[in-house]
Amino acid sequence: MIQKNWQELIKPNKVEFTSSSRTKATLVAEPLERGFGLTLGNALRRVLLSSLRGAAVTAVQIDGVLHEFSSIPGVREDVTDIVLNIKEIAIKMDGDDSKRMVVRKQGPGSVTAGDIQTVGDIEILNPDHVICTLDEGAEIRMEFTVNNGKGYVPAERNRAEDAPIGLIPVDSLYSPVKKVSYKVENTREGQVLDYDKLIMTIETNGSVSGEDAVAFAARILQDQLGVFVNFDEPQKEAEEESVTELAFNPALLKKVDELELSVRSANCLKNDNIVYIGDLIQKTEAEMLRTPNFGRKSLNEIKEVLASMGLHLGMEVPAWPPENIEDLAKRYEDQY
């Protein structure tokens, strides 16, 4: 069966996001097949930084200024520095149409992104960001052109042939993702110790959450890789598609070596030929204590783990063990 090429690879059963702020999130995904932490981490990082869409200023027109090499009376920064500061304005904008926004201010004081008069669905995400500083009696008026796009677009590509004199193109940093780092650690799944754990830190400008950014990047990869699949998957037999109605809790089909018990407890269960949780819960405490090298400490450990699953020792399980237990375990593995 060709499906085994991908179906029998382990997939993460833990994908957790924690956010320390509006702009920063950490992803932990485990377990992954050996090497997949690096493969997925690198692919997601590159797509996150290059391919997500966002909004940015593409041009600015400053009253009384003809080109970016000018200076403005009463403004401490020259126009080149002002343009560099404009590049760092973080913007969220819905829709694909080009929009305008204006700022007008008199000195003394700083002109910040929060002073900009926005229209429609534009939101300034870093209102404290300083654009320029005015001296006493100075005045400035700027009009910004805002567009949606992806990646980085240099100012030259934002320069329209029919642009009016004084319209200064700006390098556009569209990507809402500012920084991505990741590392891969070893993790354990049952008794296997060499699976990968992917830990990724995502920093955005606030227009998208780290969790959504990863979801968008994964969807982009999914869409791009789909063109390389040159076959149709064989249809499963009808009896494989229908899930057999069980007479017991599907969690009993989980193997005891997936319970993350201590080595001593796990070895005792293995030596007593206890493979599934369904085998284990039918044992009484007295029977367990008669197992060689199995003491009260191991008993308490197992009771605590079972209790967390709503189970206990000494339970009766009808129709156990089922004839096709291995097939059932694979079929129900997503339910426990």
UniProtKB/Swiss-Prot annotation:
Keywords: DNA-directed RNA polymerase, Nucleotidyltransferase, Transcription, Transferase
Database matches in InterPro entries: DNA-dir_RNA_pol_insert (IPR011262), DNA-dir_RNA_pol_RpoA/D/Rpb3 (IPR011263), DNA-dir_RpoA (IPR011773), RBP11-like (IPR036603), RNAP_asu_C (IPR011260), RNApol_insert_sf (IPR036643)
Assigned GO CC terms: cytoplasm; DNA-directed RNA polymerase complex
Pfam families recorded: RNA_pol_A_bac (PF01000), RNA_pol_A_CTD (PF03118), RNA_pol_L (PF01193)
SMART domains per record: RPOLD
EC number: 2.7.7.6
Catalysed reactions listed for this entry: RNA(n) + a ribonucleoside 5'-triphosphate = RNA(n+1) + diphosphate
Region (Alpha C-terminal domain (alpha-CTD)): 248-336
UniProt-annotated stretches for the region Alpha N-terminal domain (alpha-NTD): 1-232
GO molecular function, one term: DNA binding
GO biological process, alphabetically ordered: DNA-templated transcription
Source taxon at top rank: Bacteria
Domain notes: The N-terminal domain is essential for RNAP assembly and basal transcription, whereas the C-terminal domain is involved in interaction with transcriptional regulators and with upstream promoter elements.
Function text: DNA-dependent RNA polymerase catalyzes the transcription of DNA into RNA using the four ribonucleoside triphosphates as substrates.
Official protein name in the record: DNA-directed RNA polymerase subunit alpha
Organism from which the protein derives: Agrobacterium fabrum (strain C58 / ATCC 33970)
Gene (name only): rpoA
